[in-house]
Swiss-Prot record:
This is Serpentine receptor class T-55. Belongs to the nematode receptor-like protein srt family. Its main location: membrane. It is found in: Membrane. Residues 1-18 form the signal peptide. One of its GO terms (cellular component) is membrane. The chain crosses the membrane at residues 70-90, 107-127, 143-163, 187-207, 231-251, 278-298, 303-323. Keywords: Membrane, Receptor, Signal, Transmembrane, Transmembrane helix. PANTHER family: SERPENTINE RECEPTOR, CLASS T, SERPENTINE RECEPTOR, CLASS T-RELATED. It comes from Caenorhabditis elegans. It is a multi-pass membrane protein. InterPro entries: 7TM_GPCR_serpentine_rcpt_Srt.
Amino acid sequence: MKLRHFLIFLMLIPISSSICFDLKTLQCWPMEIQEMALMLTARNTARYDCSGKSKSEWYETGQKRLGWGIYYISSGLFFQLIGWPVIWVFITKFSMTNALKVYRIMVFIGLIEITEIWGNSVFPGFVAVFGEVYCTSPILMTIVGKMTMVQWVLGSSSAAFLGFHRLCDMIQKLEWLVNTNTKTGLWLTVLFFYACYGSIFFDTVLFNSDYMAPLLDPMIGKQGIIYSNNFLYFHNIIVATTLILVYACLCTLWSSREMNTSSLHVSKFQRSILLQSICISLTYAIPAISFVTMFVLPIPKWFFHVSDITYQLSGGLPFIMYICLNKRVREEFLHLLRVCRKAEKSQVAVIPLGNSTVSAFNN
């Protein structure tokens, strides 16, 4: 009887005509997704309207910086050159089980960083060379902005999780949170969806050649429009604070407790992992702090570029740190270089001489 009355009540409720159920219609999606879809098709919106100037006029609002462009592109390609071999060494030469399963997270972060370099180093280099702004290439700017935001949020939160993972390993009562690969994978999956949410439903960052930094404001000259990203603001605060606190706790625990091992080699190994983790965390903590500073303090124009340099280096410095701090990575990396050089020298040069050929080995 109660169920029948409830159904009658639902039937009598007037359905608002504003409710939209057709997911094929863009207007039925949230406003944030509608705006992103229009930006990805280079269509003007109320907040991202490029109709006020021609493309050549928009180029005049940017600034060509050949020197910085060369730096960004060359450093990005250099990071790619050393980054992929380091990741290859981790994947093929390290047994990522038991004590070494922390390397799974390092490889995950490394894959984020090596792909992020294209968006935070190589692409800004071309933007600097040609003096690009949002309205000169709205589609590309939006795609790169959304992608780099996902990569930054995912990479920095994964770095915080790396510290949390090490802390759980040292505090045995918390080890159950991360003691299986399934649990670790679940944590990283949650962080991935968290990063995608922040990128889709909040204002994106758009690289500007005048400021040489990613900005929320597209610099289209519209008055009274507010561009903000509270998600990114609080994320950077939380990540910076978490990284500092977690690794401070790790260092305190390391210095105060006795290691439950009689092997000096294992002790050095654990110290090496901790040092590598701290270095990775610093490459994320410093840009996060600088980004927060940009939000809360009036800063000079040059500080935008300095902040972006710290962000740009966060994608490549960890690979240099791995080579310098991890003996096995360094040895395997140098071995790969020797193999490549030996392969080049052993190539056969075929020199045509009349009707015959001579094969020469360049050894």
